[in-house]
Amino acid sequence: MATVIDRHSQPTWRDFLELTKPKVVVLMLITSLIGMLLATKAPLDGFVPWQVLIFGNLGIGLCAGAAAAVNHVVDRRIDSIMARTHKRPLAEGRVSPSMALGFALLLALAGMAVLLAFTNPLTAWLTLASLLGYAALYTGFLKRATPQNIVIGGLAGAAPPLLGWVAITGHLSAEPLLLVLIIFAWTPPHFWALCIHRKDEYAKADIPMLPVTHGERYTKLHILLYTLVLFAVSLMPFVIHMSGLVYLLCALALGARFLDWAWALYCDSRPHAAIKTFKYSIVYLFLLFMALLVDHYLPLKLLL
């Protein structure tokens, strides 16, 4: 099916907003904000400077929106085929590819300028690397080249808490890299569960997702294995004394539930297990990071 790009309709501000994938950007900014808060020295000095809070997240959000707009351009043919995405602005021809690319460039330049002016160069360059990793490496190449696209390209999507942390400290350390590792390990079981649910759509669009190339049974096994890896990685903040007992208990409970869903999916023991595993994975990551944050601001010396 050819992409519908020959319709002549005036794009609206809503079309350009949709190009940025605002829901995804909001989720990224939540993890960026959590990274900023975790980088502070709570509870005595646990506040983020307002300039970094506002302009740091603004710059990161603008660059994330730029990467999303490039994704719309590159994936416009695929989007026109899949039921979930066929009404996107480029798939329906409401915005031209050249207009979307110009919009993406404008967002990227504005985001980089804001980050350089109000945070630090390391944050700006790491954000640019994340943008290029998602827009060029993942969207432009990996997505169509290998069923391991999500694993390799997941680093770009895992970057926001690192960016938020570095915006505060100005340097890299083990703690934000561990936050990246948690999201990196979470991404495959999260996305592969959705891919199983939408396997036929990905096959129709000729995207080599793991369930399409290797089958559902193989994919379910890898979801289970990655969930085990995630469970172990999620305990590392406690091991390195980044967090305390409150986080540990939450990580154990949340991880056990994730493993329960991954096992149910592998054994085919529950109806609609794939989409339910996908939905729980979102709840899992949100609550895990909330637990990190709550633990960070609690006077844990009274609890241990």
From Swiss-Prot:
Molecular function GO terms recorded: protoheme IX farnesyltransferase activity
Ranges that cross the membrane: 24-44, 47-67, 99-119, 122-142, 150-170, 176-196, 228-248, 280-300
Gene Ontology cellular component list: plasma membrane
Alphabetized UniProt keyword annotations: Cell inner membrane, Cell membrane, Heme biosynthesis, Membrane, Transferase, Transmembrane, Transmembrane helix
Subcellular location: Cell inner membrane
Annotated PANTHER family: 4-HYDROXYBENZOATE SOLANESYLTRANSFERASE (PTHR43448:SF7), PROTOHEME IX FARNESYLTRANSFERASE, MITOCHONDRIAL (PTHR43448)
UniProt name for this protein: Protoheme IX farnesyltransferase 1
The species this protein was found in: Pseudomonas aeruginosa (strain ATCC 15692 / DSM 22644 / CIP 104116 / JCM 14847 / LMG 12228 / 1C / PRS 101 / PAO1)
Taxon lineage: Bacteria, Pseudomonadati, Pseudomonadota, Gammaproteobacteria, Pseudomonadales
